[in-house]
């Protein structure tokens, strides 16, 4: 039996429901399904008149409602539920049908599921979707990975429902296998770094500039009209301006300082460690959330461990602008690192990622959407094989101009005892990256001393070992 729905969505919690509504609102007939049937009934009751929906109560009914090849978006909780749905769907599907996992799956799972589905003649796509609840409904940034021929079957739908910036939809086929979910993972990692940089600026503005939340909210509002213009800077202004109904003071002042996380930042950092890519901005952001969670330990340490207590500066005019520049320079570094990571993963996995296209599809719909991404898109358009974004004249110059302020902020924060892990590690990365000769010569010497790991010389080919504990002579080992 062949149904009439062009595409199906199973999993009607907030993301799946909004994605299904977005698709139907674009005139595409959608079959919907949810494990708990009552949710489907409620969905049809609430939104049934927004488009051409077919509500189904069983997976058999669901697959029967779809055109061939069947195109099925799975929007269930990431992890085991995705495998469960694939297992249940597989016997009901035909050769060439397409399963699209649009949740936040970890990319190695996507690689495995692609192979498992292929063994059953099913085409599997791992698709990153960013933008949260509102993006799913009004236009997300979509990062589809998997078989390009399978993508061709859904391209028109994805392009219709994605956010649009300057007439360009925020969706592009990212690459094969796990590439889509990989890129979504790095997107989320960059989101962690962006947020950490924002909170470090907030901390300094509070404790070193001596400003209160509404005043800082206004500063973020101003910053949002310059180089920093972005969704996260914009909402920072709004969150800081919010008044708590209960206390009459700023809401942010009564929110517990313990950050949650769902794991995508950790995945990004772990992957960077495996690739050997320095990813200090994102990784420090993950560690900072970890430190924030040690609330009880911090409470004890706050009365035990010595250190300066920050005191508000008398003249804050220059300080506020210095903090803005430090935020911008650190942000450039965090993005340079994230893009370097995607480049390394692309080379390792033969994904052939178009990094300029990634910047292009992140300009709208997603959480890190920003003006700044236009600059990154331009950089890759001019230099497709770029090693590091810092080397493009625009960014080289931007960081060069900001660096005096950036260094002042790191010094001031350190003197005043304000933790700035992302600001300071970004500056250290910058200083390390711009050194032709670093100090790792000594590491090699030490490794050779205790483990005969050998070293190379700057003045001769080959590898060498010194008999440190014996006669001290050097021998060539290759
Ligand atoms: P949740 O992640 O909260 O998952 C709830 C859905 O999964 C419900 O439809 C539930 O069905 C279904 N489900 C579960 Br739980 N176990 C199942 C199983 N074994 N078999 C079949 N269905 C099962 O939903 P969400 O917040 O809409 O997110 C969906 C995906 O999108 C996740 O991967 C999430 O990480 C990702 N994502 C979320 C956001 C966001 O802002 N929330 C943003 C971007 C991406 P039930 O109704 O029967 O319990």
Task: Indicate where each model-derived feature is located.
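C-terminal amphipathic alpha-helical interaction region
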Residues: 400, 405-478
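NAD(P)+-binding Rossmann beta1-loop-alpha1 motif at the extreme N-terminus of oxidoreductases
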Residues: 1-70, 93-96, 133-136
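C-terminal substrate-binding/catalytic lobe of Rossmann-fold NAD(P)-dependent dehydrogenases
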Residues: 179, 192-415, 419-420
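Rossmann-fold dinucleotide-binding core
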Residues: 7, 64, 82-85, 100, ...
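Glycine-rich, highly charged phosphate/nucleotide-binding loops
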Residues: 54-61, 78-86
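Hydrophobic beta-strand scaffold residues
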Residues: 30, 55, 124-125, 279, ...
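Short, ordered loop/turn segments at secondary-structure junctions
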Residues: 35-36, 104-105, 129-130, 417
């Amino acid at each position: 039996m062949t149904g009439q729905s062009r595409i199906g969505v199973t999993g009607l919690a907030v993301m799946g429901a909004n994605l299904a509504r977005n698709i139907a609102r674009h005139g595409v007939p959608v079959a919907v399904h949810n494990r708990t049937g009552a949710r489907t009934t409620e969905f049809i009751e609430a939104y049934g008149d927004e488009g051409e929906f077919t509500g189904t109560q069983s997976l058999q009914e669901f697959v029967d409602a779809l055109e061939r090849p069947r195109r099925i978006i799975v929007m269930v909780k990431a992890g085991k539920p995705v495998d469960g749905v694939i297992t249940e769907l597989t016997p009901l599907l035909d050769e060439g049908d397409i399963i699209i996992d649009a949740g936040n799956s970890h990319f190695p799972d996507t690689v495995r599921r692609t192979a498992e589905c292929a063994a059953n003649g099913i085409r599997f796509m791992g698709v990153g979707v960013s933008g949260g609840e509102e993006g799913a409904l009004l236009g997300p940034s979509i990062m589809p990975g998997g078989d390009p021929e399978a993508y061709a079957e859904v391209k028109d739908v994805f392009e219709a429902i994605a956010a649009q910036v300057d007439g360009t939809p925020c969706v592009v086929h990212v690459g094969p296998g796990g590439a889509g979910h990989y890129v979504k993972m790095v997107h989320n990692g960059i989101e962690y770094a962006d947020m950490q940089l924002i909170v470090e600026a907030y901390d300094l503005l509070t404790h070193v500039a001596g400003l209160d939340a509404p005043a800082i909210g206004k500063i973020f509002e101003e910053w949002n009209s310059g180089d920093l213009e972005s969704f996260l800077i914009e909402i920072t202004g709004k969150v800081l301006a919010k008044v708590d109904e209960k206390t009459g003071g700023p809401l942010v002042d009564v929110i517990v300082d313990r950050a949650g996380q769902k794991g995508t930042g950790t995945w990004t950092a772990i992957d960077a460690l495996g690739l050997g890519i320095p990813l200090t901005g994102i990784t420090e952001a993950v560690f900072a959330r970890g430190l924030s969670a040690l609330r009880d330990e911090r409470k004890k340490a706050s009365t035990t461990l010595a250190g300066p207590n920050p005191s508000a500066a008398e003249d804050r005019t220059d300080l506020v602008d210095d903090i803005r520049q430090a935020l911008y320079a650190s942000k450039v570094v965090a993005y340079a690192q994230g893009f370097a990571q995607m480049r390394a993963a692309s080379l390792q996995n033969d994904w052939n990622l178009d990094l300029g296209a990634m910047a292009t599809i992140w300009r709208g719909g997603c959480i890190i959407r920003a003006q700044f991404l236009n600059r990154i898109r331009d950089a890759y358009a001019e230099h497709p094989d770029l090693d590091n974004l810092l080397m493009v004249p625009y960014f080289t110059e931007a960081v060069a101009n900001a660096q005096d302020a950036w260094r002042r902020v790191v010094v001031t924060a350190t003197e005043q005892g304000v933790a700035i892990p992302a600001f300071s590690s970004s500056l250290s990365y910058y200083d390390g990256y711009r050194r032709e000769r670093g100090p790792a010569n000594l590491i090699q010497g030490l490794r050779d001393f205790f483990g005969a790991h050998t070293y190379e010389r700057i003045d001769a080919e080959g590898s060498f070992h010194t008999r440190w504990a014996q006669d001290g002579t050097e021998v060539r080992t290759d």
